[in-house]
UniProtKB/Swiss-Prot annotation:
Organism per entry: Mus musculus
GO biological process, one term: mitochondrial protein catabolic process
Name of the coding gene: Pisd
The name this protein goes by in its record: Phosphatidylserine decarboxylase proenzyme, mitochondrial
Assembly notes: Heterodimer of a large membrane-associated beta subunit and a small pyruvoyl-containing alpha subunit.
Enzyme class: lyase
Organism lineage string: Eukaryota, Metazoa, Chordata, Craniata, Vertebrata
GO molecular function ontology, one term from the record: phosphatidylserine decarboxylase activity
Site keyed Cleavage (non-hydrolytic): positions: 374-375
Mitochondrial matrix-facing ranges: 50-60
Length: 406
């Protein structure tokens, strides 16, 4: 019967008929029923049944190739985007930034970066065995391009833990402070952006801004100010400008992990007020600054405000991932990345007291504070209209080198 059925099927095919004879259809149905029955049977020990597994199960058995393919494809796409951006930059074309959406920012902020940074801070303070110090520090030096010939102590065995290594001191002659210009760089780093502050918006990187008032917070109490405040009806920018004919300027310096982590006074000025903003600790590298609007307003930061010979002056140290610890040498009450402080609040401290009517005087180049790893310094200050920056965006700069002058 099977043979005749097979012949009937062959005759049908040879005859060019597009239908199958009933015996062939019967065999096909029976075969499918038999295979379906096998799939429903439980697997027995020592019996392999891979030939009856559905396609869905085969993919579940191989997640690694799928993840590698997906991740590789995304990485390739990102590399193509970077290559395209570099080509456009070489042609002199401006590349509009691609900002993160609200849900992307919220998702990133939900990552426990403060907790992770506290854990990293404690890990950095663990004393390393003497024999392990050289290989660990050498790996860090090689990875981030640290120049140890500038360090006051070049012997790697001298640094008991990573925290001491990050905060290493420099040789006195390693960073001469420029005396010809009125404003010098407070730290080593990379210039992200600089220029005049217009319409109460500050440029984070080219094409991405943040609110001046959100960044600095509301004006301090009038008794803390060394100069009378402007009318409350003025814009926030105009409230900071104290002298007619002056402008408000800004400069953003990004400190990479391999840079010198201390920061110094950029000019001769008097600090009258400190404001601490607990916040997130998102990465502040230039790529993230191009992606997240008002990144510096989201992150934890310490704002020092006061005055210099031309009016208002401020220096802000912005925290980042694994950089929850910001230290100001003369402020022992400051405790950053502390679980007792909640996001969205701020803590004020006035350095103007009955015993000290002026505040804390700082000389240009004098040590001011330090990070435990790379981060960002933002300068916002008042100066006459003929103030000129001697910079270009993206350039590397070292502590003590000129930022600008009149």
């Amino acid at each position: 019967m099977a043979a005749s059925g097979g012949r009937a099927c062959v005759r049908s095919l040879r005859g060019g008929v597009l239908w199958r004879s009933s015996p062939c259809h019967y065999e096909s149905t029976a075969t499918r029923h038999f295979l379906g029955t096998l799939q429903k049977l439980p697997l027995q020990a020592g019996v392999r049944n891979f030939h009856t597994a559905p396609v869905r199960s085969l993919f579940l058995l191989r997640p690694v190739p799928i993840l590698l393919a997906t991740g590789g494809g995304y990485a390739g796409y990102r590399q193509y985007e970077k290559y395209r951006e570099r080509k456009l930059e070489k042609l002199g074309l401006e590349i509009p930034p691609k900002l993160a959406s609200h849900w992307e920012v919220s998702l990133y902020k939900s990552v426990p970066t403060r907790l992770l940074s506290r854990a990293c801070g404690r890990l950095n303070q663990v004393e390393l065995p003497y024999w392990l110090r050289r290989p660990v520090y050498s790996l860090y030096i090689w990875t981030f391009g640290v120049n140890m010939t500038e360090a006051a102590v070049e012997d790697l065995h001298h640094y008991r833990n990573l925290s001491e290594f990050f905060r290493r001191k420099l040789k006195p002659q390693a960073r001469p402070v420029c005396g010809l210009h009125c404003v010098t760089s407070p730290s080593d780093g990379k210039i992200l952006t600089f220029g005049q502050v217009k319409n109460s918006e500050v440029e984070q990187v080219k094409g991405v801004t943040y609110s001046l008032e959100s960044f600095l917070g509301p004006r301090a109490n009038t008794e803390d100010l060394p100069f009378p405040p402007a009318s409350s009806s003025d814009s926030f920018r105009n409230q900071l400008v104290t002298r007619e004919g002056n402008e408000l300027y800004h400069c953003v310096i990004y400190l990479a992990p391999g840079d010198y982590h201390c920061f110094h006074s950029p000019t001769d000025w008097t600090i009258s007020h400190r404001r601490h903003f607990p916040g997130s600790l998102m990465s502040v590298n230039p790529g993230m600054a191009r992606w997240i609007k008002e990144l510096f307003c989201h992150n934890e930061r310490v704002v020092l405000t006061g005055d210099w010979k031309h009016g208002f002056f401020s220096l802000t140290a912005v925290g980042a991932t694994n950089v929850g610890s910001i230290r100001i040498h003369f402020d022992r009450d400051l405790h950053t990345n502390s679980p007792r402080y909640s996001k969205g609040s701020y803590n004020d401290l006035s350095f103007v007291t009955h015993a000290n009517k002026e505040g804390i005087p700082m000389r240009k180049g004098e040590p001011l504070g330090e990070f435990n790893l790379g981060s960002t310094i933002v300068l916002i200050f008042e100066a006459p209209k003929d103030f000129n920056f001697r910079l270009k965006a993206g350039q590397k700069i070292r502590f003590g080198e000129a930022l600008g002058s009149l």
